[in-house]
Amino acid sequence: MNRNINSIKYISEETKMLILNEKDEFTSDKLKQFILELNIKFPHIVYAQAKLESHNFKSRIFRENHNLFGMKVARKRPTTNKGEQYNHAYFDSWKDCVVDYAFYQAAYLSDLKTEHEYLEYLKLNYAEDGKYIQKVKQLSRLPW
């Protein structure tokens, strides 16, 4: 299951530590750039998920937990979360949350090749709202 954690592409270990330790303010442009830097699969869909899950980056879970994706505490994979608050994982920074999502993808989604496969996985294993995929698709079509 964890065999693909090393598939996350970092320029170097030094860069990885700089990224994780940097405590800069959140902007949607910084999120887009960071998703690309981490080589996260299907970046426009992941960005749409973050926007949807965080209620356009305004939810309490995002503001207080730095949790962009509504992630629960990971129990069976590497994680950057620091614990649980409001029934969701909390992180030291929004960047830690994005790194955690990269770990999630590496652990569970590395074999998925197409957007269709990814959306199908989300529908069956991630979405709590019956219209989640429809909403993500709609948001992912917006320019970013």
Residue ranges of each PLM-predicted region?
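Catalytic cores of secreted/periplasmic lytic hydrolases that degrade extracellular macromolecules
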Residues: 1-144
